[in-house]
Amino acid sequence: MKSLLNIEEHPLEPFLPANAKLLMLGSFPPQKKRWSMEFFYPNLQNDMWRIFGIIFFQNKEHFLNPDKKVFDKERIIDLLNKKGIALYDTASAVRRLQDNASDKFLEVVEQTDISLLLKQIPMCKAIVTTGQKATDIIREQIKVKEPVVGTSEPFEFEDRTMRLYRMPSSSRAYPLPIEKKSAIYRIMFNAVSYTHLTRPTK
């Protein structure tokens, strides 16, 4: 029997605005020593909030504090509430096989119940995954074809017709410039019926 001592429980509660029409799911947060705030995507080396800054404010540093060392959690939450974007992860408990945040070295001990999340956000019509492990876990729970990165596939959940979007990882380990990642995310946000998001002017 494997030791229970190394099991990490998810440190955050699901972020589920009542008006959420989009649920973004990663795999699991990085180790606390890599956090710059108590929220999702807390690592300064992860570009998720820079991607959001480019798309919604034409400024990749929009969600950084003036010292550039911390993300501004309150500004992030304000945007997510206004836009109806929910966040959580596909693993609720993991064991780290190495001392890093790579999905490759995460052993999932307990999966998140995706259907339970969706039942709490009845207006949600799309799920976004940002990595292979998250995509695999969703496909174990929901009957849906695996999307190619940058595309989506339809699926049914109860009385809802939904889509699963597979986005490129916001990790800098994923070899794609942030501008190209932002362009792919922008297409997804527009497809989920957000106000039309144009490319920033140069």
Per-segment meaning from a language model:
Residues T195-P200:
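Conserved small/polar residues in nucleotide/adenosyl-binding loops
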Residues K2-A126, Q132-P147, E158-P175:
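A polyanion-binding, active-site-adjacent surface
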Residues E110, K181-F189:
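Binuclear metal-dependent hydrolase catalytic cores centered on His/Asp/Glu-rich metal-binding motifs
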Residues Q58, T201-K202:
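A very general structural signal that marks isolated residues within well-ordered alpha-helical segments
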Residues V148-P154:
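An amphipathic alpha-helical core segment
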Residues A191-S193:
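Acidic, proline/serine/threonine- and glycine-rich low-complexity intrinsically disordered segments
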